[in-house]
């Protein structure tokens, strides 16, 4: 299954897969992580399933990376869980969250898998949402702080960064994602 040497694809082509922290990690109440808006919605809104365990990547990341290597992956695009890194409004960094992602990144690199990191994939911390979330200008400074922490912690090994996954979904499926507060006519207003 190793397509890395297929002559049809150019040298350096990145073979791999992608995931989102909320879809694969699980461990939503472990390692200092606090709730994200998607955690609350995954328990109550269709089509989401409860993400408390998900694929349990939080506990099986090393095995998961081994499987990626066996499949011939040369890249893995994953997201960081903002509430695992900055769990509270005091802005303090969670060392357990940083260590989890450091270990994952190091393991990927040990298997010659390029980490591609998405900074936000629907998992705004509940504490940010309680301040108004994307509708409040304070989110600019909060997101900036989070991003700078990530660059400082992982930037020596991560070359490829994505800021926000599927920005359009914030509008199109805002209600499902927990972003409909203060927007009674979200269905009409999204267009």
Residue ranges and their predicted role:
Residues 1, 53, 60-63, 145-146:
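Short, conserved clusters of charged catalytic residues that mark active-site
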Residues 2-45, 88-89, 98-191:
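Active-site region of glycoside hydrolase catalytic domains
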Residues 12-14, 58, 75:
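A common structural microfeature
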Residues 46-60, 134-138:
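Active-site mouth loops of central-metabolism enzymes
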Residues 55, 92-95:
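Residue-level marker of alpha-helix boundaries and capping positions
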Residues 57-66, 87, 97:
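Internal amphipathic alpha-helical repeat/solenoid segments
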Residues 60-81:
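Catalytic domains of carbohydrate-active enzymes, especially glycoside hydrolases
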Residues 80-93:
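Glycine-rich, proline-tolerant flexible connector loops at the mouths of alpha/beta enzymes
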């Amino acid at each position: 299954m190793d397509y890395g040497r297929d002559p049809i694809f150019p040298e350096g082509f990145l073979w791999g897969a992608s995931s989102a922290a909320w879809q694969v990690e699980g461990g939503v109440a472990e390692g200092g992580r606090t709730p994200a808006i998607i955690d609350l919605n995954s328990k109550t809104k269709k089509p989401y399933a409860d993400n408390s365990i998900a694929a349990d990547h939080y506990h099986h990341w090393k095995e998961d990376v081994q499987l990626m290597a066996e499949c011939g992956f040369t890249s893995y695009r994953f997201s960081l869980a903002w509430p695992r890194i900055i769990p509270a409004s005091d802005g303090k960094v969670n060392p357990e969250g940083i260590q989890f992602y450091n270990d994952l990144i190091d393991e990927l690199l040990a298997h010659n898998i390029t980490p591609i990191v998405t900074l936000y994939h629907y998992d705004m911390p509940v504490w940010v949402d309680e301040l108004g979330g994307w509708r409040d200008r304070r989110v600019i400074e909060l997101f900036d702080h989070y991003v700078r922490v990530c660059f400082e912690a992982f930037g020596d090994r991560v070359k490829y960064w994505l800021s926000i996954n599927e920005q359009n979904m914030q509008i199109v499926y805002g209600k499902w994602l927990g972003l409909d507060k203060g927007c009674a006519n979200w269905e009409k207003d999204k267009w």
